[in-house]
Amino acid sequence: LYKDHVIPDLRALKVLNRLRKKNFKDDTITLELVEELGKDGISVLDQTKYLKPLMPGPQIFTKRRPTENEMLDVAFGFKAAKAIGGMDLGQTVVIKDQAVMAVEAIEGTDACIRRGGMLARGGAVVVKTAKPDQDLRFDVPAVGLETLHSMMETGCKVLAIEAYRTLFVEKTSVLKEADCAGIAILSVEQEHL
């Protein structure tokens, strides 16, 4: 448990003990840390307060547009991503032909994309959404160059993010590379699928 003999201090042990009585889901751990910081008068702010310009509205960003079948996968993927988000599992799914190839869990977005893309054997759709009850102080969904590179490694063809609720970082570089690779990137609102 304590690799390299790094042992938590008494305060951290108390936090871990409280968590043991609850669960070790991402949101539970993070909320416990936010509450602990609050005891010292430290407020954790909404991450999006200063990052709204990085959270685009609905649009297609790339030269390549998703096909009709890929849009069916996007719609299916949104439902799946919201379902896993509601269980605090992750925020990303990889879909092909309306079948779930991978669901993000503790391994993170990029590992999920690589696993799902490999299982799909090319042509997969990646969908990233916010959790249904997303606490905007932490774990706001984000995509960037690493996301795109994971997709390119395994031949994924579409990245769909939730409009207004996903951070799109390194956008200029991402779009340039996506256009060269023939990958479609779009942001959508679930109610418009």
Q: Where are each of the predicted segments found?
A:
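Short, active-site-adjacent cap segments at secondary-structure transitions
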Residues: L1-Y2, L51, M101, L167
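Conserved mixed alpha/beta catalytic, RNA-binding, or beta-rich assembly cores of soluble enzyme
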Residues: N23-D27, D40-H149
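N-terminal glycine-rich phosphate/adenylate-binding segment common to multiple enzyme folds
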Residues: L1-K49
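Feature captures the catalytic cores and cofactor-binding loops of soluble hydro-lyases/lyases
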Residues: D4-R18, L31-E32, A111-L193
